[in-house]
Amino acid sequence: MERTDGQLSAHSGTDKQHLLQQLFSDMLEDIYYAEKHLTKALPKMSKACTTGELRQAFDEHLEQTEMHVARLERVFGLLGRKAKARKCEAIEGLTKEAEDLKKETEKNTLTRDVALIAAGQKVEHYEIATYGTLVQLASNMHLNEVVSLLEETLKEEKAADLKLTSIAEHSVNWQALEAEG
């Protein structure tokens, strides 16, 4: 294969396909770790909420996250593999940031809920980006059943993000401003 700079590429088409499959596998293990990690982090976020509406959103997303873990285990099975988690530094950092925000805000305040929404949305955006990439890679590899499962999770992650946006825009942010003002 030729590179655009005129040099021969060190990788053949088969090697490049293998590299993409390896990237897909690594990302799958990464998001599996992330989802399992979130099953422990979401209850802490829920417990820290001031408003019932936000607590309910985190509780509902915990239920979905448990389904995401099971769905990923099905994906691994479809690929003929045992589910394997690969430490996800991104989710570790995002959940640590959520813990830090919780410590930096006063308990039972709407300001804490604003911080928790921001932290939750950062997690959702990471998941949306990861699942979006996984869907595209699986599609390119013609893994149709895998695509369907990953698209289902992607749709749920986007809905969770929109729910947090709605809670922020329609109640928590305004209430926090009024409480501070």
Where would I find each of the regions flagged by the language model?
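Amphipathic alpha-helical hairpins
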Residues: 1-181
